[in-house]
């Protein structure tokens, strides 16, 4: 079988000349090339290298698309008026109070929101009034989350992501996600099928892989939910089985 090789030269590439694919034995130098050609390789090796490069470029493109969606959604959230925000938050609380997951839960985990995110102060008030214990996440070196109880002694620090996180020491008991009754997952954008774009760290994607759907939900403004998924979805991305907006339960288990 004839060896098929790509004859590639930096000068050729910089001048946007065509890449040569040939079935002929290659001399030490190819015509039009100013430097020695690369070693002859089988077509299979070339295909594998091309596939690897294409995969890397495609994955980078997908990440760029998600980052663009994040930036667009942040602008939309920042443009919401305080009045509209509060009105939607109050309606979401009313919907949440009727959910069996909420009614049954004795422990509830939530993440301290940033300014443009869905605010949870009303949720915290409702949880404390109902006698529920609130937990907040702590980031770990392996980019997963563990949870600690939020009580009157809890103090917070701001992480590199700008999120408030509890300050802990060796005396704080740590809980895994599977130990908690209900986990309210933050996010920037959702589809009506439960797809989610978070903030890019992947912490919840890793942490919730083995948590059953019934105990996972998100709270969102209506502008955060779209019927169409126009962003890349990876196998490692978690789905949100229950999403609640001011208009009701978008998707339920």
Model-inferred region functions:
Residues 119-122, 146, 193-196, 228-229:
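Short glycine-/acidic-enriched loop or helix-start segments at secondary-structure transitions
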Residues 65-179:
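N-terminal active-site beta-alpha-beta segment that forms phosphate/nucleotide-binding
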Residues 12-13, 18-20, 115, 141, ...:
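Short, solvent-exposed loop/turn segments at secondary-structure junctions
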Residues 1-61:
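Metal-dependent phosphohydrolase cores
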Residues 62-64, 75-78, 83, 129, ...:
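Surface-exposed, charge/polar-rich loops and edge strands
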């Amino acid at each position: 079988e004839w060896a098929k090789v790509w004859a590639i030269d930096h000068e050729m590439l910089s001048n946007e000349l065509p890449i040569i694919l040939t079935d002929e034995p290659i001399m030490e130098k190819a015509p039009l090339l100013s430097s020695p050609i690369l070693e002859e390789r089988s077509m299979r090796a070339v295909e594998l290298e091309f596939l690897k490069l294409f995969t890397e470029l495609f994955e980078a493109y997908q990440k760029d698309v998600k980052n663009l969606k994040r930036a667009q959604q942040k602008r939309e959230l920042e443009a919401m008026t305080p009045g509209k925000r509060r009105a939607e938050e109050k309606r979401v609380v009313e919907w949440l109070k009727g959910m069996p997951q909420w009614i049954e839960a004795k422990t509830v985990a939530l993440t301290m929101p940033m300014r443009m995110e869905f605010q949870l102060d009303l949720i915290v008030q409702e949880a404390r009034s109902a006698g529920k214990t609130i937990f907040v996440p702590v980031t770990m070196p392996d980019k997963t989350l563990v949870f600690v109880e939020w009580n009157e002694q809890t103090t917070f620090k701001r992480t590199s992501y700008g999120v408030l996180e509890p300050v802990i020491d060796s005396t704080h008991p740590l809980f895994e996600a599977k130990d908690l009754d209900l986990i309210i997952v933050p996010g920037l954008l959702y589809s009506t099928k439960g797809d989610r774009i978070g903030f890019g760290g992947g912490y919840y994607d890793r942490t919730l892989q083995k948590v059953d759907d019934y105990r996972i939900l998100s709270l969102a403004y209506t502008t955060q939910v779209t019927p169409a998924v126009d962003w890349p979805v990876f196998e490692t991305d978690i789905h949100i089985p229950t999403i609640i907006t001011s208009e009701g339960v978008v998707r339920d288990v």
